[in-house]
């Protein structure tokens, strides 16, 4: 919404500049999008009166005029405007004037005739051109007065974004009310006098819909619809972005911008019988003021007479009942329409009007009478007429109810986070137009004003208190509270575990806890399956001791259907009945199981498929364990269904939590499977998360030493590495195996293992003697324990 700053300051004029006023409005929640001057700077332009007009002796399109500017001799000015005539008044740029664009006026000659200035059109003083030619000023414009002063061009247009909840601010009055509150000033409202009825003519109004709780109308006869709109009204409307039309339209638009009340004038002669406020009849048609014909539905409210619809209520009038130059008598409307009765209807017809915008957001239901009196006053002053009595039709039970809201000091302090003085709360709400009553217990009972539809709960009142206090005045303070350190999350959630496995390319399988007894026996020949007394089918007759009993049939099913790469996992229960003497002793162990068959990666254009090996599969299991920060060790597995050289038992603190590896080749043959990788992990152990300890990184250089050992090939590498780490002590930072060699130069039954040893001290540089001593000690211990010898280079 655009408004004139000068117009606003006639209502309330705080002692602040334009920029500060703009900032105030923004902080009040009325965001200023733009603050633009009405006209660019210029000087030396005054009101002039054209005394004579003669034809230029040497140019058909030029005239030689004499112009009175109120001082000294009349000026001779050559002018080419088609509308120049004797007796008219227009802006005159005198010698030395500087117009917008730094255009300087000098004495000169046009086709041989001296010109002592320039008669100006609107565009030459940075105003909008309405006609081709000079800007014609009213006959009563005082000659010689500075045009900026006369047209009040030292003004700004304030463009404000009104939020949907602040329909009360769609007017000068609404904005002025906010400025007055924040600056603790009184508004200078114009004196609105009621216009007494001079005739008895009136129109009966019948409301037959719930969408119009209050409707006012007035008959005005013998109106001069051709009366000129005064310059001050034209300028006010222009600076609000509204074009002038005729005196009646301009008056209703002026009241709309001034008070926020939409109004409409009908040609009285075109109304047949009673005025009805009703719902449209199905397929009823209406030609609107914009010449658009619309077909109405019964959820659209209309103003009608006994024969036809005259207007879409609250949106736009109809062409058939509009005021024309031949109109003498009018019926003036001012009404309160319920927001829900208007909302969405304008958009349905592709319309967006000032009236619908205001009615949709809520117009003050007490405003129609004030607006009717204001419009009557202006029409009487500017266009004359005889006024009938104001007709009021009302359904008072449908008017908005002003319910009291209870507000406690503690609620204000708690919601805002700082203490607000009780006196300020009462004063701020009172200045906003609320009726505030202080109860015996100090609690406030607050009745919002009729124009504030957005005040419904106590939080709304607190928001208003903060807004008036100033959001930029909210005190900065750290909250004080009693806190307890949150307990460390020591569980790796199942959902996270599931997501981790899915990310590795596995698909989840959900199966029965029963299995094929034959497969159970194949997987673990040493244990007899626990059979069900009444199985649901012959292939689900045993309680599964391993989830592989369920996953392997899934793999077989998919491989038999041309799936070359199969990867499944299951989170389920397995039954540990090896040590159970009875059903009561039977343990159900939550377990994560993995099965993978096929290539390491899916088939792709950029690389040939590579078969998965033990280390690929072990890496995936390690990634699952790493997600839960489980610290594990790997030792050779002795499980009979696993490949003896490509499997590992997984230990935590020396206790097995599962295994990983390849199925035994003989079992793969029995089950008609290619290379199949499997793993089972105790779910409870995987979900147990371990706290990571902080260790400061050493700033001092590390030293690497390598040793190659000839050692029996039946000694576990893990045992050798653990012995090296134990013997190396605190100075040995880390060690790893980087080479294994058998063949020429290494006797049968032995292999060469090469280890890297990284030495580092946390707080100083190590000396060679310390490292040599540590290396010698490790070599001696390995020789004594495993009969290891250093391999010659």
Describe the residue ranges of each PLM region:
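Phosphate-backbone binding interfaces of nucleic-acid-interacting proteins
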Residues: 1-195, 331, 350, 354, ...
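A carboxyl-terminal module marker
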Residues: 2, 20, 27, 431-434, ...
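Glycine/proline-enriched, intrinsically flexible loops and inter-domain linkers
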Residues: 5, 23, 28, 63, ...
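Beta-rich nucleic-acid/ligand-interaction surfaces
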Residues: 39-43, 196, 482-488, 511-528, ...
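Conserved mixed alpha/beta core segments that line enzyme active sites in large multi-domain catalysts
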Residues: 47-76, 234-235, 252-320
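Mobile "lid/hinge" segments at catalytic clefts and subdomain interfaces of large enzymes
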Residues: 111-124, 131-136, 148-149, 156, ...
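Extended, well-folded interaction surfaces typified by the phenylalanyl-tRNA synthetase beta subunit core
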Residues: 174, 405-409, 413-566, 705, ...
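Terminal amphipathic helices with adjacent charged low-complexity linkers/tails
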Residues: 181-207, 383-412, 419
